[in-house]
C-alpha cells in the first residue's frame, strides 16, 4: 500500500504554473517512463515462478518512482551547472 500511495502522489502532482511545471518535469517524466519499461522487463525476468502479475506491478512502480527521482535530481544538477556558467 505504501508504494501505491507514493505512486498516486507522483501521478497527481500539485497544481503549479503550467509552463514552468512542464519544462521542469519533462526530462524526469521521460526518464521515469523509461524506467517503467525497464521495471516491467526485470519484473518479468526476476519474479518468482516466472514473474507474477503482482511482481510486475511492483517492479514498475519501484523503477518508475526511482526514475522520477533520478530525473529530478539530474535536472537540478543540470540547472545548477547552467547557473554556474553564467558568470560575467
UniProtKB/Swiss-Prot annotation:
Keywords: Chaperone, Ubl conjugation. Residues 40-88 are annotated as: Pseudo-amyloid region. Ubiquitinated. Degraded by the proteasome; degradation is stimulated by polyglutamine (polyQ) aggregates. It comes from the Eukaryota. Residues 11-30 have a biased composition (Low complexity). GO terms for molecular function: unfolded protein binding. Belongs to the hssA/B family. Expansion of polyglutamine (polyQ) tracts, resulting in protein aggregation, is a cause of neurodegenerative diseases in human. D.discoideum, which encodes many proteins with long polyQ tracts, is resistant to polyQ aggregation, thanks to proteins like hssl63/srcp1. This is serine-rich chaperone protein 1. The gene is hssl63.
Amino acid at each position: 500500500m505504501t508504494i501505491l500511495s507514493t505512486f498516486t502522489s507522483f501521478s497527481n502532482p500539485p497544481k503549479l504554473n503550467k509552463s514552468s511545471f512542464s519544462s521542469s518535469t519533462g526530462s524526469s517524466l521521460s526518464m521515469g517512463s523509461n524506467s517503467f519499461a525497464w521495471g516491467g522487463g526485470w519484473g518479468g525476468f526476476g519474479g518468482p515462478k516466472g514473474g507474477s502479475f503482482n511482481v510486475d506491478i511492483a517492479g514498475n512502480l519501484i523503477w518508475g518512482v526511482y526514475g522520477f527521482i533520478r530525473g529530478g535530481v539530474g535536472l537540478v544538477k543540470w540547472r545548477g551547472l547552467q547557473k554556474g556558467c553564467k558568470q560575467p
